[in-house]
Amino acid sequence: LGDVYKRQTLDSTEIIVLATAGGLFLIQIIYYLCLYNRIHARSRAVKQGDTHFTQELPPISVIICAREESENLRRNLGAVLEQDYPQFEVIVINDGNTDESEDYLTILEEKYPHLYHSFVPDSSRYISRKKLAVTLGIKASKYEWLVFTNANCMPQSNQWLRLMARNFTSRTQVVLGYSGYERGKGWLHKRAAFDNLFTSMRYLGFALAGSPYMGIGRNLAYRKELFYQQKGFSAHLNLQRGDDDLFINHVATPENTRVETDANAIVRMQPLLRAKDWKEEKIGYASTARLYHGMQRWLAGFETLTRLAFHASWIAAMVIGILHFHWLAAGVAFLLFLLRFTMQAVIVNKTARDLEEQRRYYFTLPAFDLLQPIQSLRWKWYCLFRKKSGFLRK
């Protein structure tokens, strides 16, 4: 009887590990319910008519920066030019002259009188070419409201501009939209698609919670006046990146920022084919994330830390329980994992459905849940040891 009693009594190590797993579980629950569920909650509120939008449709300047992307322009530009919107112009800034982009844009201008294009001079040396392209597009624009996307992005409907514009209230200066991938095959694309979805749930979730801290230029709008008030990119002119995320980090406030989550306001990119492209994109954002103002960066990092610690603690508690024949302790540890997984699967997949992502995450979710923060730490670690000159303008 004494041996049985000892087997059922948890030692101090088991109690500490199990209590740690329980505490980390509660932290993760708070993050999912209060942050990652925001997009789904907003989508539901919009459907129920609980969100205010403006009825005005001010003229818009759409700015697209393309770097030798004639194929992307042929594929995607038509969907931008044929938006159902009363008054807008499309400005394409072409960086590079080694492909057919220039000829194609010249021909297209004859069909679409609201299309204009310019180019980045080859001699430009004192500002990153992307920031120069954005600046040239803004200076060439006629209208106050600027909407940005990339040449490799296609709006999912002709209502994209109308849905972005319904957020252009008198107090609004910044509108953040969602950009995703078209469905593709392969492990690389699946990882990138989940990372993109989860990253969007995070930064759009913060914005919907009243704490905007970044934006992505694939689907973004702001006022021209705001750009000039900030003297363009002067605050980080020495960096290659930062034309979208770092700029929005400096200008976005709870009062001046709104988020558009309608599925018809989404732009999508083609599936990833090369790991190098994804790596460069992630490293680029990791290099500017170090300069973000506000607590959001640290709160996001804390979620990553508690996620990894939770997985380590529940696994440790279950293994120790099994080795000591404490089946109740092992069962409680596994139950914590199961409860978090269930809540996570519900929120992630509801958000994916709201954003019309074609992929759902069930059996692959635990793997992506571990890989995503490890990948994030990998990019940050790479930035830490990469020469600073690699992130400066050339």
Where are the regions that the model predicts?
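N-terminal membrane-anchoring/stem segments of glycan-assembly enzymes
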Residues: 6-54
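Catalytic donor/gating beta->alpha subdomain of glycosyltransferases that bind UDP-sugars
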Residues: 168, 174-199, 225-228, 232-297
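Long helical/loop segments within the catalytic core of UDP-sugar-dependent glycosyltransferases
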Residues: 112-133, 137, 143, 163-234, ...
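Membrane-embedded multi-pass helical conduit in multi-pass membrane proteins
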Residues: 307-389
